[in-house]
C-alpha cells in the first residue's frame, strides 16, 4: 500500500476481480450533505459530490430552481413572509 493511501482521507472499497481475488480500490470520500443556512437541516435536491463531479453536472442538477436554494423550504417561506410583511409596512 502506498503511504498516501494509509490515511483515512481515502475510502477503501473492496472489489472482487473476475479472477476471484478481492482487491482494495481507494477513492476520495464524498463531502458532507448540504445544510440549511438558518436551521441546519439537511437540504434535499443538492447532490453530494466532489468538485470534479459537480463541475460535470448541469446547473439545474446542482441546486433547486426556486428562490433561496440555500435554505430549506420552511426557512425560505419564513424569510419570504418577513420580506413581504416589511414591504407592506413601509408602503
UniProtKB/Swiss-Prot annotation:
GO terms for biological process: translation. Gene3D superfamilies: 6.20.340.10. PROSITE patterns: RIBOSOMAL_L34E. Residues 48-69 are annotated as: Disordered. It comes from the Archaea. It holds the Pfam family Ribosomal_L34e. GO terms for cellular component: ribonucleoprotein complex; ribosome. GO terms for molecular function: structural constituent of ribosome. The keyword Hydrolase does not apply. InterPro entries: Ribosomal_eL34, Ribosomal_eL34_C_sf, Ribosomal_eL34_CS, Ribosomal_L34e_arc-type. Keywords: Ribonucleoprotein, Ribosomal protein. Belongs to the eukaryotic ribosomal protein eL34 family. This is Large ribosomal subunit protein eL34. The gene is rpl34e.
Amino acid at each position: 500500500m502506498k503511504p498516501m493511501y494509509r490515511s483515512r482521507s481515502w475510502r477503501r472499497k473492496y472489489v472482487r476481480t473476475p479472477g476471484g481475488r478481492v482487491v482494495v480500490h481507494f477513492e476520495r470520500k464524498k463531502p458532507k450533505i448540504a445544510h440549511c443556512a438558518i436551521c441546519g437541516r439537511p437540504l434535499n435536491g443538492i447532490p453530494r459530490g466532489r468538485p470534479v463531479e459537480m463541475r460535470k453536472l448541469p446547473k439545474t442538477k446542482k441546486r433547486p430552481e426556486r428562490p433561496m436554494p440555500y435554505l430549506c423550504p420552511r426557512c425560505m417561506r419564513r424569510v419570504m413572509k418577513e420580506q413581504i410583511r416589511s414591504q407592506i409596512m413601509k408602503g
